[in-house]
Amino acid sequence: MAELQQLRVQEAVDSMVKSLERENIRKMQGLMFRCSAACCEESQASMQQVHQCIERCHAPLAQAQALVTSELEKFQDRLARCTMYCNDKAKDSIDAGSKELHVKRQLETCVTKCVDDHMNLIPTMTRKMKESLSSIGK
């Protein structure tokens, strides 16, 4: 993928992840740590009970992190498939005898369209993740 296009996607995804971390994940981390601390304050509990309590406290955060990771992987896979299609199209054009400059332009245009299309998916993906993260916290 063209470096500029890659940078555009990376900055948009980084911004989304920072927003999710600030608005959702961080609150869940705070709850998890306070919950875990309460487990440790339980003087009558056995070591195993305290450990299980801490595991229960950590479960929502682990679920949230898994959700974000899964959505980002799906997004990355879709973008990779799109750019792979562009590469295949360019290779087919070269095999058919097209000029290299024409093929490069065609490839650039195709990759830019992939990036534009996927950039347009980010707001919906963000909203969907925020909704899912909110429901995990409850």
Curated annotation (Swiss-Prot):
Cell cycle in keyword set: no
Database matches in InterPro entries: DUF842_euk
Modified residues annotated as Phosphothreonine in this record: T124, T126
Keyword Membrane: no
Tree of life domain: Eukaryota
Signal peptide positions on this chain: none
One Pfam family linked to the record: DUF842
Cellular component per GO, a single term: cytoplasm
Keywords: Acetylation, Phosphoprotein
Residues bearing PTM N-acetylalanine: A2
Protein family: Belongs to the FAM136 family.
Database matches in PANTHER family: PROTEIN FAM136A
Name this protein carries in UniProt: Protein FAM136A
